[in-house]
Amino acid sequence: MKKIICYFTIILLTFGIDAMEDNNKQIYNPKETKFLEEAAGAEALKWAKERTNKTEKALQAMQEYKRIKKEIESIFYDQRKTLYGVIRKGYVYNFWMDDKNPQGLWRRTLVDNYYKDKPNWEVLIDFDKLSKKIGKKVAYRGVSNCVQNPNRYLISMSFGGKDEMFFREWDLEKKDFVKNGFEPITSCGKLLEGKFTYPTWVNKDTIIFNPVLYKDEITSSLYPNSLYIWKRGEAIEKARKLFEVPKEYIRVSADKLLSDAISSSLIFISADKDFYNYDNYILDTQDKNFKLQKINMPSDATLQGSFKEYVFWLLRSDWKFKNHNIKAGSLVALHFTDLLKAESDKTSLKILFTPTENEVFNFIGTTKDRVFLATYDNVVSKVVTFTLENEQWTKPVILKLPYQNAIFRMSSYEDEEEALITIENAIVPPTIYLWVKTHELKVIRKALYSFDSENYVLEQKEATSFDGVKIPYFIVYKKGIKFDGKNPTLLEAYGGFQVINSPYFSRIKNEVWVKNGGVSVLANIRGGGEFGPEWHKAAQGIKRQTAFNDFFAVSEELIKQNITSPEYLGIKGGSNGGLLVSVAMTQRPELFGAIACEVPILDMIRYKEFGAGNSWVTEYGDPEIPNDLLHIKKYAPLENLSLTQKYPTVLITDSVLDQRVHPWHGRIFEYVLAQNPNTKTYFLESRDSGHSSGSDLKESANYFINLYTFFANTLKLKLIKF
């Protein structure tokens, strides 16, 4: 499935009161800063460019810059990088970027050839050449294969790092885009783009997609609000509108309900009322009237996939089903025909997974004859497999993972017997396994680059938060370092939107930071999904301060254990994580030495006015509601900034093309902080990266060069010879 899913009272601590001063007084003049609200406005771009140039010049003058640049470029452009892929009709398909192909290559090789150190790749689309031909940076965003005609794909793309996407039909046999094929261009020649407009094949001559065909077909969160069915050969203006959601909804999307081998005509339609509640429907495209039938399931339950004629649903809240209480976080399966029935008639429903205090659902993966249920047990992967025999689910078989603290990932097509599985952890590079039809895992690719895991330590520890709750965190360091309070330490967390932070392998972090004596820490604070729905809800809305307090608890524990001290403790976070670290800066500046605030959400009073802000109301609360506003103002980083307080050295990043978190957030924070004579700030604005580190490989490499130079210099990391 392609559905885009990515008890407490607020305690007002003394540090919160001190930081507030008078947050009813606006800290900037709205008239003077109005120009910063226009993402691509000439005055705003000039303002941002001047500050970006100044920051780049300062970073490049630091003694660590050249050495870090050399190391990071060697990692990014290394031909020995892990070759991730997916199996389709005897081939492994892979997307690859290097220094000669920064926009990337979509390519394939035979499965038998994939075992080799240097597979013989057949390039299908060269996105650098395509970008030159079009005259704009074209970024690859994914593909959708037509089962009825396996030689046809829909290639999703975007210009730069934008969330707005478009697609073109690709002929695998001719190795070229299809002339007059599916491509959202109007009769006037206008290319239609829309945020996350992934198309869905109905059959070889029909697709369903969510374009912005007319100006008013967007929601208040700036996502498409309409679904169309489009037949081959007809003008896009002639496409039939199937469904439209109200403007206050977030978005509408469509995908196949079941695999094409079972039914190609059934379409699952999701209308997102808010971030956690949905109106879901089934559309049978064989019905000439295209009537939508509403699914009878809890509104906050989400479709996770299908296997044969059964669908999997994840519950976010407790569900009283036939006088039985099914716990929030449970995964249930039921026959697709039961989706439309009343509760009393859902005879096929089966609970496949019930969460425990430490174990939560991660994802469902399927092959043609097998289901993989991946969970996190104390934020470490656990996997079982099972199947369906005579309409009964078989007993789950534990898939033994090769080492402790393993993290499991899977890429597969539901009509293929084989799948590629990746296993890794924070200090063990990824190994790719082939799941074969005999139900065995075979090593197919190991990391070709050298990294000696035996020289490093990965531990999971706990800190105690303000209310006694234990907050786990992972810590990585080089064997033999002394815990003398002087270790440069990077602490990361997210703490929002049910996102689970797990200890994946980061070659950059390990080789640039940990290898040089730095310490890396990943905190699993509340607001995330590491321990299920209640872990998230504990820091949702007016309870937001919980996430910040959890983060402070981990920070204080690192200092208490003499692992580091404020002078050497750096924190980084992006998007919601940017909000987290900026609040840490304003509420507890004495705890930290350096802060990277990346594509951050910072203007919490006006966030609904920018980008996708309207879609976040169920996460943060609504600043237009007095009680919500009261709580938001207590932590809102922009409103709580002081023009005299000495804050840690801070790096702020944003992007002109970020269509989720508008660059206004980063710009206004820099604008205000620049007036504080006691705080050193750096500011970097990208033109093309969108809500990420870069729209191509070179842009991403430069981003991390600047980031790690900033931390290495500010936190006094002593670089050894590379």
Curated annotation (Swiss-Prot):
Instruction: State the superkingdom.
Output: Bacteria
Keywords recorded for this protein, A-Z? Hydrolase, Protease, Serine protease
Taxonomically, what lineage is the organism?
Bacteria, Pseudomonadati, Pseudomonadota, Alphaproteobacteria, Rickettsiales
Q: Give the E.C. number(s).
A: 3.4.21.-
Q: Which organism is the protein's source?
A: Rickettsia prowazekii (strain Madrid E)
Cellular component terms per the entry's GO annotation? cytosol
Q: Which GO terms describe its molecular function?
A: oligopeptidase activity; serine-type endopeptidase activity
List of catalytic residues = S575, D658, H691
Q: Which GO BP terms, alphabetically?
A: proteolysis
**Protein name in the entry:** Uncharacterized peptidase RP174
For this protein, the record's InterPro entries field holds: AB_hydrolase_fold (IPR029058), Pept_S9A_N (IPR023302), Peptidase_S9_cat (IPR001375), Peptidase_S9A (IPR002470), Prolyl_oligopep/macrocyclase (IPR051167)
Family assignment? Belongs to the peptidase S9B family.
Q: Which PANTHER family match?
A: PROLYL ENDOPEPTIDASE
Listed Gene3D superfamilies: alpha/beta hydrolase (3.40.50.1820), Prolyl oligopeptidase, N-terminal domain (2.130.10.120)
